Amino acid sequence: MGGKTKQAPRTKNNAKPSSSSRTAELLGSSTPIFVGFSAQTDGGGLVPFAPGFASAEQMPDSFDAAISPQTQIILRKLSKKDPMTKKKALQELHELIEQSDVEVLKNILPLWPKYYLNLASDPEHTVREQTQTVLQLLMAKCKKAMAPYLKLLVPVWLGSRFDTYAPAASIASQSFRDTFAGNANRSREVCMHCQVEILEYATRNLTFHTAATLSIGKSLTPEDAEQKYQRVIISSLKLLSFFMGQTAQTEELSQVKEGFGTLVAHQKFWSFAKHKVPAIKAAWFECIYHILQSVALLDVITPQKTQLTNLCFQFIDDADPVVAPHIWGCVLLLQSNYVDWFVPLNIRKTLLPKLSSLLQNGFNRNAQAICPNLLPFLSKVTQASLQDLDIYDFYQRFFDDMKLAVTKKFDPPLSKSDCIVIHNAYFECLRFLMQQINNNKQREQKEEEFSFSLLDNNVLEPIAWLLKSDSTHVKIFFQHSSALVAFWDRQINNRLDNGDLYAKLLNKFWIRIFELVTQDLSAEEVNEQLLGHVLLLVQDLHMANPSLESPSVKFVEGPNEKIEKSEPTTPVKKAQEAAAFIQKELKQLVIKLVRICLDKANKGSGSGTSSSRYIEQIRTLTKMFNDAAFYKSLTDDGDLASALNKFVSLLGQLSCQACESVVEIVFEILPLLETGKRFEYIENTLMKLPQHGVQNLLLHRLLSYPLCAEAAVRQMLSGPETCEMIARIAEEVVVDNDREKLNLLHKCFFQTDTGDILINAKTVDKILLSMCGPLEQPVVDDAVEVCGSFIAQIMPVICSNNNSSLHVRQHIFLKLFKFSLEHRPEDYLSEDTLWEITTCWQDGLSSKDIEIDDDMLKCCAGIVEELANSAELKADTLDGMAEAMAKFVICSTENIEDEYKRLERIDETLTALLETPLKTTDKVQQFENHCVLLEALHGSVTAGVPFENACLSRNEILPLLQRSTLNFSTIYKLVYQFPPPQDTNDPEDELTEDYCDPNADVLKKWNEPLIAELLQCIRVAGTAECWLEMSVLQSSTEELVLILSEKVQSFMGNSSDLVAIVKERLQQAAVQQSSVIDCRLLSYLRFCPQYAAFEESASILLHEDLSENLVTQGALKTYVIALQFLLPKLSQKAITLSSAIMGTEPPEIWVKAAVFHALLLNNFEGDVNEQTDRNIIVSAVQFMTSIGERQASQKDLLHYNVEIQRQPYESVINTVEFIKLLTEVLKRFPYELSIKNWDAIRIGLSSWVLSVSKSIAQYQDPKTSLFIVAVYELFAALIDFIRSEKQKSSTELLKNMIDEWDSLFAKEVNLVLFKSYYLLTHEVSVDPGFQACYEALLEQITPVIERLDYSFVYSFCKSNSNITLDHLCNFLFKQLYSVQHSVRLSAVHSLRQLTPHFVADDIELNEKQSESLDASTTICKWHFLNRFEDYLTRYDALITKYLEEFTFKLSELDDLEPIDRHNALSYLFLWDCIINACAKSPVALRAVYTNWLNDNKYEENFLHFLFRAMPVDILKNHGAKVHSNGVYKELTWSQQKDRHLPLERYACHLYTEVLRKLPAVVRRWWNATQSRQKNFIDNLTTNYVSSLICSEELKAIANRKEKHENMQVTVHSSTREVLAVYAIDEARMELVITLAPNYPLGAVKVECGKQIGGRASSRNVGMQLTIFLTHQNGTIYDGLTMWKNNLDKKFEGVEECYVCYTVIHQETCQLPKLTCKTCKKKFHGPCLYKWFTTSSKSTCPICRNVF
């Protein structure tokens, strides 16, 4: 493969030393790394750098023999350059240390320091981290064994604590703490023990090494080397700081002082103070800080004092947050340690500019680090330190600069924490300076003037500016200003004011504040911001705390005490001492402000908003002072009444919130009045106010404690005006759902000790009537829950002490009762609220607060009837209604002490609640008849009891079912007995005192009406189960049926005497044989305890008992019908010939026939038959033969050729069951039938179809419809048998039978059955009540219609004048639009069966017209597809709206309207028939059909609609095959018959079909579309459809069994190619057809290989075939066939057409037949017609003579 020359293989684990010459040279260097300080001279010089000096320890070449080879390998890998190798070696070393004992590890300990010193400063941070992990483990394991090597490790170990990579530093710190964790002094002891090594290590790094010397022998980039050097410098400086911190308390530091003396004397050490890397700079100043802190080391740094002072003050304005704290620490220590600290400095040039810049720039956003140092710094500034600068000039400049930091707007703004710390420092310094001046008793006048100037310039001036500013500093500045003023005030009170300085300052402050506030607020228009800031200032002054809360500074108040700087602590707030000025100056200021605001509020009466904003401020101000004197001062009159009137006068012009504030003020003033005047003012003034909002506020106050306890207030609340107010509020709550108003209404119902409430009964009635309004409104919202909960909460109150009128209480009860019945928890109604409402009226009944008389009971029953008769009810609603009705029955009667009267009242109540016109006996019977007919039509049961009418609409069934479910559920809840709790030994299961017996309220006695109601509901339940099995119901209706059925099953499983009574009544009713449903109800007995215990065997045991009892009693009909219902649940062979029923001879034929039918179903459904089963077959055939013989003598026995409606019901059922038995035997055992039986079947069928023909008009007659279905099904069974027999060899008997059928019976029977079906479904008006039965009748017949022989039908209609072909087509087209799916599918099937006959006629007509030049103009008017034209036009109008909303844009897909499934399926079924007609037609006729479609542009809407109907997910992902293409696969006929077939799936199937069978039609449409639509269709077809069609077509070509003479075809599926070879004699022609990726949308590629006749001929053939495959709706094989036929004709000598130059025409597939009389050349008719049209001449294309 090339590359480098293969070298000798590497030894495993690199066990051998490196052979590299460069590596050997480096490893061979013998210069040691750690020279120590032994070579250091007294002068402090170091060993000069010499060649070969390396910063890293030299790794050993050889190892001690005691070290294992594996360990040696690991150690060698530690010295490699590759970081990955070192990391793996460290991991291996870590594992080795974990697994080895201490004795083994002692061998490597002498080597470890050398490796550690090298690896701890490795450029790769993960290597450093892993190194520290190894050291941690090694120290933990070896402990004292490491002592000899400690001095070598500690300097680097401590330096690693400050590694810039946090994980490595953390591990090093943790390992050091863990190792020396014995006591608190261990770290100091270690530092002192290794002091020489630590200082030498740090000094060497700081003064000797460079980036180059630290990286000798390492292949590092300059950047990596520099980073390593910086890490070492930082760690060394921090190491020294740590060392000084640990050894600060040590007395003997001579060696340390010597080492530090050497270090600070070296000029390179001082260079780090100006290093560009902030971390190095910060570490250096930190180191200096620790030196200055140490008293012992102060002498070491003193010689460099000048240099150090200049450095520190040079960087006093450093902006770096890491560096600045250390610099300022050094500055403060310099000021503390050296009295002459200022001597080296030029204050004007060095200090002042930098300090000013720092202050003005907001401390360079580093305030938190610098500001705490300002006060200590300022305290050390004296007049002497300022040299020639006046100290007060310095102070003024200092505060002016700092004032900018306080008031200046910074961009971006300062952080909140920075603002706080700057303000703290500002006011600390101000207070300090003021206190200094105050403490100076010998002060001069200029000092006082300076203090006044500070107050003006640095406090009052910023306040004046901030009042009008939007600065973020407003609040914090006002707080500090207030604290400063409060401090002065307290100092005055404590008599610490020397020379009245503080008093003068305070006086000046208040004068200026009064000026500022009054001047600013006296303007006509006052800014909202200004108003807010004034209020904020006043609030801060009111709450001013004299103690300056600062965690860093403590101010002493005595003149002789010192200012200290303390460590930061958490501030603890003390009890606030109110400043004396609050009740003096501040109070006057507040009074002034309130009066100003009141005046402005009155002036702004025209503007409610303007007045309201002043009221907010007034309310805030009045909260500060609320004594009588304060309020009297607010008006010129100076009394409280004037103040009240002034505030009340504002109420009419304010907002709601402002009014609330005014009312609060008013009710603060009112208690200051005398009692009589107070209530008089409320009643005569306040209660007369017209504003609704104000009235609400007043009522809220009056209804609240303590006013509500006043007798005068109670009297006010009873007044008519107050009553109207409360009623209005109740009405408003219903509308706006206001919580405040609702709370006010709740207050009205506060009960006193006597049970009375605050309002009278009339007011209560009005509230209740208003609040119950939402409970009866159809529109549901939050008001329902609010009002319902409110009424439920106050109901106990209003029912006691006659707090409301009786008729209102009853009205409210009815509303609550109806609400509980009607509603379930919803979005607008919580479960808790519904529970409150329900328990409310229940408690009212139980406590006798509400009594149910006859009128009330009638009203309650009316409510139940109204709700039960409403729209479709949900299952949970019905259950809730039943629960409420049951509770109503119990609660309304539980207080009747006389048991007899109580039971009598329960019966009356139940009768009233359950009686309904929705569920009468006649309706239940009609429902039974309806469902019995449905089930009998299905064939699962015999309608053995006569009935004349089965009409019942679904709209009538649903109310009946709902009411039955409601009634049964109600009774169920009243009579169901829960099993007693089981005794267990578990103490947790013991019954407690609060145990509630669930059977306490269960009815123990039942009257006859209750039992009759139960039985009737059970009948409805059994009938409904039949309805569910036979019908397709909505999910809600299905759920209703299942709930009723489950309730009945649960009831029948209850162990109570009532169940025993019901069981006995059910058996009695069944024995009477008066109803089919009575027989069905016997199946409910299997849920009784005696059968239910056997679970799956319950049905078998029940059948055995029924068989014995019913046959013994002679109830044979009952037994047979019950057997039919139980049959699906019985095991195989549960019925045999030895069963009791088989020993009877019933007079009715149907009983015996039904028993044999059941025998066959029960014995022959298994996989294995026994020998005894043949006896059943023989017995059944014998029974059939006997009935046939009886028919011979009794002609009217089996109703041959009669009108069924006129026959007795019982006799018709006999015939129906006999026909069903014939059908079943014919399906199962046709070869057991004798010639007599076959004659009976054929003759009987031919006669019965005549009876059907005569009776079809009376299909609504139950027995007639049953007879029709039986005859049709017998025909289907016979045709299935005959068709299967024709496919195989058969006996002579059967051959003769089939031949006789075909010749004598088939035509007539087929035609009669078709005409009967035609009459049954053509323009029939069906009674709405019979619609379901009619649909069931068609469901049974339509599958039979598919078995008709449509050749008879087509021939009949072709020659008949009553039902012509036009009638037939229109009939089938209309059925495509039928609402019944089976009818539509039957129509599709019929059209498919008729299509070959229509096509055959069109072929004949086409051939006749092909001779004429006018063929194209005549044929299109008469072909088969022309019959579709009217219906295509109708459907186009229906689908247009769907096409308009979809223009192949992805953005449209989420907004598409759902497609009407019925219309869409009908339309697609119509096109399915059209596609089938084109597919069944030959190429020539197919061209005519498709031209007709194209001329009328029908395919455009159809194909567009197909895409509109496809799944949205596929349309969204049309550009990539995200989903499976299974949805586009062809549907079988059985799949298409599925009534639940999705429309999207059928649309995809049709798209594939039309592409497969009419590709040219789709291709032509696609080519004409717009580019967006074209790309969309192309992508979808390529991704989902093309692969399916290509694989099918190629597979079809490969699987062709017939072989063409002279042509051989080969398929290459992988490349989508078809290779065709035509060979005759020596000539050979080749053709390669390649399918496009988007085939059949894209044209195929035709390549001609060897051709007879040269290149021109080859090109001609290719073009002809390409044109055919592109423009004709044929398959690839059709094109190959045409190509082969053309060649055949050529070789046969047939002359080609001189227009298209082919022998066979591409569309008509005809030979050239039209001959020119002049030149004798032959032409195709369509070619010649096209020539005439395009040339506008009627001349021969060759000789130009008139044709």
UniProtKB/Swiss-Prot annotation:
Residues 8-24 have a biased composition (Polar residues). It is found in: Cytoplasm, Cytosol. Coiled coil: none annotated. Pathway: Protein modification; protein ubiquitination. Residues 1-24 are annotated as: Disordered. It is an enzyme of class 2 (transferase). A zinc finger (RING-type) spans 1697-1744. One of its GO terms (biological process) is ribosome-associated ubiquitin-dependent protein catabolic process. HEAT repeats lie at residues 65-102, 106-144, 346-383, 424-461, 508-547, 612-653, 664-711, 789-825, 952-989, 1005-1042, 1053-1090, 1129-1166, 1216-1258, 1269-1307, 1330-1363, 1364-1400, 1500-1539. InterPro entries: ARM-like, ARM-type_fold, LTN1/Rkr1, LTN1_E3_ligase_6th, Ltn1_N, LTN1_UBC, RING-CH-C4HC3_LTN1, Znf_RING. SUPFAM superfamilies: ARM repeat, RING/U-box. It catalyses: S-ubiquitinyl-[E2 ubiquitin-conjugating enzyme]-L-cysteine + [acceptor protein]-L-lysine = [E2 ubiquitin-conjugating enzyme]-L-cysteine + N(6)-ubiquitinyl-[acceptor protein]-L-lysine. Its EC number is 2.3.2.27. GO terms for molecular function: ribosomal large subunit binding; ubiquitin protein ligase activity; zinc ion binding. GO terms for cellular component: cytosol; RQC complex. Keywords: Cytoplasm, Metal-binding, Phosphoprotein, Repeat, Transferase, Ubl conjugation pathway, Zinc, Zinc-finger. Its main location: cytoplasm. The modification Phosphoserine is found at S566. Component of the ribosome quality control complex (RQC), composed of at least the E3 ubiquitin ligase l(3)76BDr/LTN1 and Clbn/NEMF. The complex probably also contains TCF25 as well as TER94/VCP and its ubiquitin-binding cofactors. RQC forms a stable complex with 60S ribosomal subunits. Belongs to the LTN1 family. E3 ubiquitin-protein ligase component of the ribosome quality control complex (RQC), a ribosome-associated complex that mediates ubiquitination and extraction of incompletely synthesized nascent chains for proteasomal degradation. Ubiquitination leads to TER94/VCP recruitment for extraction and degradation of the incomplete translation product. This is E3 ubiquitin-protein ligase listerin. The lineage of its organism: Eukaryota, Metazoa, Ecdysozoa, Arthropoda, Hexapoda.
